[in-house]
Amino acid sequence: EMTSSLVGSEMCIRDRGKWIFNKLASKPVFINTVNPEVRTKVAYNLLREYGYFNGATSYEVEPDPKNPKKAKISYKVEMNNAYTYDSIAYVRLRHRIDTLVQRNIGDRLLRDGDNFNVVQLEAERQRISSLLRNNGYYYFRPEFISYQADTIMNPGKVALRISTKPGLPRTVLRPWKIGDISVFLNGYNNEPPTDSIRYKDMTIFYEGKLRIRPKVLYDRLKFRPGDLYSQQQQEKT
């Protein structure tokens, strides 16, 4: 009976792409747990995420002539040529943000001639966000970066434009500096602070008896009032 048959899967890969084989090939399983249409769609989406916009996927169920309770599903993936970047531009960035991005352009993760790659696009978002957050832009997040990819002008090529999303609030687009510095020390059993002490430009809130010298805490701070906010320095602290 078909619902209790075992099915194995294999893939016919044309051109390149062992990585997609590793994602989709599987050991024999009951056929009622296999959904080849979904797996074929997954393969198709993977191709597009890695720049193979002209790729195609299909499958075929092949019964075992020696055992009617066994079958094999063959997946065929035709990758064709990947789309590559023929131009990458950072556009419509505010002056200070544009200056930061251009000053660190050597660290970018996207290069002319590279294959289109969704994973790298997301990594570049993270890089730009970290760069800005380490230079005062406290409220900036990766999702505020927008991409526009044009594949019409040159067949097989992608003209990529990178910008900040329109309509972002001013709080996101301006750098912030460190103001008052407060350190909160809970008790041994996580009791909330009940007292405070001022040391230079730092306020320490503590519970019970202060068990550490203020200078020790102060010297561990990687920033001072008036410094531009830096996520990296905050994490080091």
Identify the function of each model-found stretch.
Residues 35-54, 120-141, 232-237:
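Amphipathic, non-transmembrane alpha-helical segments in extracytoplasmic/periplasmic proteins
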Residues 11-12:
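Active-site loops and adjacent core secondary-structure elements that bind or stabilize anionic groups
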Residues 31, 38, 42, 52, ...:
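Extracytoplasmic
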Residues 80-115, 125, 129, 138-237:
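Acidic, glycine-rich low-complexity/disordered segments
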Residues 19-23:
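Extended amphipathic alpha-helical heptad-repeat regions
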Residues 24-30, 63-64, 112-113:
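A cross-kingdom feature marking solvent-exposed beta-strand/loop segments within repeated
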Residues 1-8:
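Single conserved hydrophobic/aromatic residue that forms the stacking wall/gate
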